[in-house]
């Protein structure tokens, strides 16, 4: 299978000095509601469709379908071409596609759900649940036992197996058992390197079956697909009503040749799911709903904290040094494999998480942007269609051109309090006897009298003080605010301690002249 700093607007508050400071105008806060973001995206959806259609034509795809999810809603879909060339049946948004390795995160979610139920541990040796693997000795005597987590993160040491693994999809449980009992080969020492392995995810399927006491397909259907309302998602293409599935093709010269459609089998856990765009959008919405962390009652098939575990960088898997933004500016990114998902961070600080899928006859990709609250999904019925590239461009259109915002960071009460206290210290508004907001290290790191002189000099350069902005949080214990004066502004960055009553451990100031 082929895989592939928050900014919150400042509310400006006025304060009284010897003469009353004027209020500055307060910019509007970010409206992160689904309706507001739908309105931002709407004028660019025609460009999104044009991007997908251009890709489909350039790649000569038989057919394709794509969609945009914002929070819990599939807000836009588009289609291209044919699901069945002989019947000239067009692709619709309800057409079933095999999504290949996009299935892996379902398998990972099932493993983590069993972990949450106390039925397995991620550090369990795989051989505890798949005794047939005990026939394979470790690479070296000091190699750790291959664990469930090694399988999840593609670090078991098995060789990359895309061409071979893609043809194993329909092998029987008995054939798979015999294969394992004969022993398997390693390409690298367990736990030391990333290498993409379909075998690893087939083993995870076998673990689910053993631990749950029912086939992994049924466990995932019962615990994930059914609760999400994914009624048109199945493991075996034979379960799709006649005429409802996109047939897979490969290209030979100018011709499209049909690819055989493999039935479900022991390797399905690595890439066997068949689904529709609306069904998969429900799954994408579940992952989006894991963000931000909050106190709400749990309502998803998998705990929100567990989903966020899946979304973390676990095993470094790539560095794209030459990537560029839509405007052509350098925008390198790094990627890591998590639990059934690929985590990616670019030089703007934008995080995207998702997975590609590729099989003989099919190619697909999805990614979601947890800080922006949207997802991009696309399926095609051409062998290894590689829709990751177009999904990347569409994500960039929605962020860079449309301007979909990042989710604002909520200002913690202590951060707001300390910002006001620091401002009072800097502009000498602190009453005698008021406790300092500084931690015990602060005036060990800075000579008190020299720091006071330097701070006074900077504040005096502002001229008449007009306002202090609300703090712009980086997180609950770190942020920036500005002291605004007639001759410029003073940007103040500060970080609080991990104490029960957090105090200021670090503070940096930067003067910005008016008109500079």
Residues covered by each model-derived region:
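Short, well-ordered beta-strand elements
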Residues: 354-355, 365-368, 372-381, 491-493, ...
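Short, conserved catalytic-motif segment at the N-terminal edge
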Residues: 37-99, 119-121, 132-136, 173, ...
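Bacterial N-terminal signal peptides that target proteins for export
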Residues: 1-7
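Short, surface-exposed loop or secondary-structure junction motifs
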Residues: 80-85, 138-358
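Short, gly/Ser/Thr-rich active-site loops of penicillin-recognizing serine hydrolases
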Residues: 315-324, 350, 378-450, 515-516
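Surface-exposed, charged secondary-structure patches
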Residues: 332, 453-499, 504-506
């Amino acid at each position: 299978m082929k895989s592939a700093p928050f900014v919150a607007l400042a509310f400006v508050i006025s304060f009284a000095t010897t003469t009353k400071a004027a209020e500055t105008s307060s910019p509007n806060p970010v409206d992160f509601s689904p309706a507001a973001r739908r309105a931002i995206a709407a004028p660019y959806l025609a460009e999104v469709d044009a991007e997908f259609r251009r890709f489909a034509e350039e790649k000569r795809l038989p057919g394709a379908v794509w969609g945009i999810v914002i929070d819990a809603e599939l807000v836009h879909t588009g289609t291209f071409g044919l699901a069945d060339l002989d019947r000239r049946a067009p692709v619709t948004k309800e057409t079933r596609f095999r999504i290949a390795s996009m299935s892996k995160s379902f398998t990972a979610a099932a493993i983590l759900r069993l972990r949450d139920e106390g039925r397995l541990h991620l550090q369990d040796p795989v051989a505890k649940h798949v005794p047939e693997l005990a026939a394979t000795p470790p690479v070296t005597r000091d190699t750790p036992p291959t664990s469930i987590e090694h399988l999840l993160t593609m670090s078991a040491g098995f060789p990359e197996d895309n061409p071979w693994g893609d043809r194993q999809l329909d092998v029987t449980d008995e054939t798979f058992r015999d294969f394992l009992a004969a022993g398997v080969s390693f390409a690298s020492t367990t736990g030391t390197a990333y290498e993409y392995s379909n075998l690893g995810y087939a083993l995870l399927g076998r673990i689910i079956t053993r631990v749950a006491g029912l086939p992994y397909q049924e466990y995932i259907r019962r615990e994930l697909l059914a609760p999400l309302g994914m009624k048109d998602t199945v493991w075996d293409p034979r379960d799709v009503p006649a005429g409802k599935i996109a047939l897979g093709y490969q290209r030979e010269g100018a011709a499209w040749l049909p690819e055989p459609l493999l039935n479900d089998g022991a390797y399905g856990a690595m890439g066997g799911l068949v689904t529709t765009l609306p069904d998969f959008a429900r799954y994408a919405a579940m992952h989006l709903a894991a963000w931000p962390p909050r106190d709400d009652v749990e309502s998803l098939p998998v705990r929100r904290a567990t989903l966020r575990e899946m979304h973390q960088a676990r095993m470094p898997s790539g560095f794209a040094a030459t990537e560029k933004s839509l405007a052509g500016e350098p925008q390198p990114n790094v990627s890591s494999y998590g639990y059934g998902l690929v985590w990616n961070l670019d030089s703007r600080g934008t995080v995207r998480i998702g997975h590609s899928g590729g099989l003989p006859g099919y190619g697909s990709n999805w990614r979601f942007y947890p800080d922006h609250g949207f997802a991009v999904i696309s399926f095609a019925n051409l062998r290894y269609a590689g829709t990751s590239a177009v999904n990347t461009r569409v994500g960039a259109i929605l962020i860079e051109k449309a301007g979909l915002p990042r989710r604002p960071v909520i200002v913690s009460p202590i951060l707001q309090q300390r910002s006001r206290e620091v401002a009072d210290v800097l502009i000498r508004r602190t009453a005698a006897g008021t406790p300092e907001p500084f931690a015990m290290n602060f005036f060990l790191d800075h000579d008190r009298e020299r720091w006071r002189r330097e701070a006074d000099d900077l504040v005096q350069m502002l001229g008449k003080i007009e306002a202090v902005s609300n703090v712009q949080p980086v997180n609950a214990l770190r942020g920036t605010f500005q002291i605004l004066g007639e001759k410029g502004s003073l940007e103040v960055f500060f970080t609080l301690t991990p104490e029960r009553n957090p105090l200021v451990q670090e503070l940096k100031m930067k003067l910005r002249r008016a008109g500079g």
